[in-house]
């Protein structure tokens, strides 16, 4: 008799005491049985770990499958995900964030899709949760893998690391880890490369993950070092996609990826760092790209040095 697929859910934990209860309960209450839980304590300064362990006590049938791994010093999100994978034993890895929550049948649906398709990576739709508002988000995964990779590069498909069921042997054999410190851009570095290398990518046509945003969570301004790591992430991605045999198939998508990255940089930067952002990717024409009109206008205004207006638009309107 074939052994059941085992899943390792890996969750970095830092500063999550407001959210950890709902997150952990949603993981413990999965209808799928064969799950281990790897919580990586990235030196959180609050009571997240104590609260997590208190919640686990309510699920004695799961307690033996719960493991907390402690970092000796704060290392960031990408390093925490890496640690989770290295401590996992499941056939598949499921990365998850400590402020989100899962539908009870989520892992069962992911596993069923993996069994049916043999995919290295399985994704699903998700709900965008903001306060009392729940908005379903439908993603597109074309049957042609090259089309999907191009959609990822150009941000037409979701590039999140969380909420994907990924074969553990596929990760380890291909060393699919983001470099430590690329916490703002780990998704963008990893997911297009994973999709390119995967023998098959599959999708569950249902919203299984609840991705939670809180007031103020999207308006953080990062320091210059964070901007530099985001530029570095694009360089890493470009190095990979210009070094493959079919690089020409992704040349135009890479150019557009840089423009999307520039928009992201403006969204992250303090106004004082706009000159640094403005200096990036100026060899790529904006108006002949397939960026939406709002992003084209934003980059044009920024190119005209209308920094105050650009900052106002970014932080008061959705771009």
Question: What are the functions of these language-model segments?
Answer:
Residues 1-231, 301:
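Nucleotide-sugar donor-binding/catalytic module of glycosyltransferases
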Residues 43, 71, 164, 258-261, ...:
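Polar/charged side chains located within well-ordered beta-strands of beta-rich proteins
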Residues 51, 147-149, 249, 276, ...:
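Exposed alpha-helical structural elements
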Residues 59-62, 178, 248, 287-292:
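Alpha-solenoid repeat scaffolds
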Residues 181, 245, 305-306:
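Glycine-centered secondary-structure boundary/capping sites
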Residues 199, 208-214, 220-248, 261-288:
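Catalytic core of nucleotide-sugar-dependent glycosyltransferases
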Residues 247-256:
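All-alpha amphipathic helical-bundle segments outside canonical DNA-binding/catalytic cores
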Residues 270-319:
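Membrane-interface aromatic/basic loop that binds lipid-linked glycans or pyrophosphate carriers
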């Amino acid at each position: 008799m074939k052994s059941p697929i085992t899943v390792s859910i890996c969750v970095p934990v830092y500063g999550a005491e407001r959210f950890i209860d709902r997150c952990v309960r949603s993981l413990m209450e999965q209808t799928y049985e064969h799950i281990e839980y790897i919580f990586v304590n990235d030196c959180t300064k609050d009571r997240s770990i104590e609260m997590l362990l208190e919640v686990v006590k309510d699920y004695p049938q799961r307690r033996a499958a719960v493991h907390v791994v402690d970092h000796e010093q704060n290392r960031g999100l990408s390093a925490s995900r890496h640690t989770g994978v290295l401590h996992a034993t499941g056939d598949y890895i499921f990365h998850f964030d400590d402020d989100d929550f899962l539908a009870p049948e989520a892992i069962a649906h992911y596993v069923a899709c993996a069994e049916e398709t043999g995919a290295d990576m399985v994704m699903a739709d998700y709900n965008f949760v903001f306060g009392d508002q729940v908005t379903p988000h439908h993603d597109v995964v074309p049957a042609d893998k090259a089309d999907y990779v191009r959609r990822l590069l150009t941000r037409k498909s979701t590039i999140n690391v969380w909420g994907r069921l990924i074969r553990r042997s596929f990760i380890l054999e291909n060393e699919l880890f983001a470099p430590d410190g690329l916490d703002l851009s780990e998704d963008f570095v990893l997911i297009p490369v994973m999709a390119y290398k995967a023998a098959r990518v599959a999708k569950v046509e249902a919203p299984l993950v609840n991705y939670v945003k809180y007031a103020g969570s999207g308006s953080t301004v990062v320091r210059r070092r964070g901007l530099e790591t985001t530029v570095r992430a694009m360089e890493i991605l470009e190095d990979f996609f210009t070094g493959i045999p079919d690089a020409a198939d992704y040349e135009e998508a890479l150019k557009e990826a840089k423009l999307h990255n520039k928009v992201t940089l403006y969204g992250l930067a303090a106004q004082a760092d706009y000159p640094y952002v403005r200096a990036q990717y100026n060899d790529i024409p904006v108006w002949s790209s397939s960026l939406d009109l709002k992003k084209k206008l934003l980059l044009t205004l920024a190119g005209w040095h209308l920094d105050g207006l650009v900052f106002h638009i970014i932080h008061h309107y959705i771009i």
